[in-house]
Every structure is written in C-alpha cells, then in structure tokens.
C-alpha cells in the first residue's frame, strides 16, 4: 500500500477535540480535498448541527449555502460553467450578485441559487468554500491552511474575471463595511505568489500544497 499524501487526525485544542490534516511528502490540493471529503460521511466526529451531534452530512439543510457567503474560486467558476453548459458571463449574470460583480467581487446570490430543496444541485463542482465547510472544530493550523487556500482561489477568480473583462476593477462605491473588508483582503492576496498557481491550473490536482504550507 502506497503512502497517503494527506491524512486526517484528531487532537485537542483549547480543551476540545478538533480535526487536523498532515501531509506525507508531495501533495496537491486534490489530495487534501480527497482526504477531507470523508469527514462528511464520518458519524463518529462531533458536528455542531448534526442530529444528536453525530451524523453524516448528506441531506443536512444547515449547510454552507445558508450560513456563509459563497464566493467561488477560479477552478470552481470554470467547472461550474462547463457543468451547466453556459458561458462565463451568463453564469455570472444568472447566479451571482451583479452589484458585487460590478464592484469586482464574485459572490453567489443569497440564498445560493444552486440550492434545490436545501441540497446543492452542483455538488460535483461546488466551490472550495463549500467543500471545506464542516460544522466541527478544526485545529488552528489546519484552519489557517484552508483559509489561505480558499482566499487565494477566490482572489484568483477576481483577478481572472477582471483580465477577461467580465468584471470591473474593484470599486468601493456604495459598498458595505463587509464588502470593503473583503476587498481589502482580496487586494492583499493579489500580491501572493500562490495566486498564479490557480491562474495556471485546470484542476485542483494541478495545485501543489507545499507553497501554502510554507508561504
């Protein structure tokens, strides 16, 4: 049996059990996603919103689409358009908040337009922010890794859309305090070398984890 590139483990942090990941040699973002997905089907891990706190995630109606702003990463944007057999501009006009798009930020409608009876209708091509969502405690280092990867992908989507003429350059006109905070974060991440990894990738398997582990 070969070495597993990414594996999950449980530890305690701040007196509570939490989930973390460790890498065993070279690994890709797809390896991380492959390791992460089984958490959703693991009924032995404490989940805040699950029935009796221990259940699989399938069918749960308290999901990322209802509890978080859904901002797609670049790989997800491309995969969504392909999955839905539409062009990028139509994808944005139909499923994203146009006032945010006009300000240079890609953000799904609220509630998410892809929710059908509380279930994601594009599950195979959902965004990183959705793939990583789980209502259990995550170790700090792992949480920071996931945050960094997700924000990098979201930033890459904004950079790409701007270059393609699909959105305008970022503007703070008429934006909320949250929008302004998000714009500051995106501007900060634009200078990160890891953004290029998303811009040059076709799939999550094309993105190495190492640059995010040692930025």
PLM region spans:
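Short loop/turn segments that flank or connect secondary-structure elements
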Residues: 1-215
């Amino acid at each position: 049996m070969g070495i597993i590139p990414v594996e999950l483990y449980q530890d305690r942090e701040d007196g509570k059990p939490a989930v973390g990941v460790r890498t065993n040699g070279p690994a890709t973002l797809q390896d991380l996603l492959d390791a992460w997905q089984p958490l959703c089907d693991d009924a032995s891990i404490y989940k805040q919103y699950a029935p009796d706190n221990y259940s699989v995630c399938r069918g749960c109606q308290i999901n990322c689409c209802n509890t978080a702003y859904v901002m797609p990463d670049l790989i997800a944007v491309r995969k969504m358009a392909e999955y839905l057999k539409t062009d990028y501009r139509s994808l944005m006009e139909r499923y994203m908040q146009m006032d945010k798009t006009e300000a240079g930020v890609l953000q799904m409608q609220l509630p998410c337009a892809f929710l059908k009876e509380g279930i994601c209708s594009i599950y195979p091509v959902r965004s990183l922010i959705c793939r990583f969502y789980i209502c259990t405690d995550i170790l700090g280092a792992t949480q920071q890794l996931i945050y960094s990867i997700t924000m990098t992908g979201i930033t890459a989507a904004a950079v790409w859309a701007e270059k393609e003429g699909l959105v305008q350059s970022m503007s703070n006109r008429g934006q909320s305090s949250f929008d302004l905070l998000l714009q500051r974060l995106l501007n900060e991440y634009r200078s990160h070398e890891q953004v290029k990894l998303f811009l040059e990738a076709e799939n999550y398997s094309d993105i190495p984890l190492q640059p995010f582990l040692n930025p």
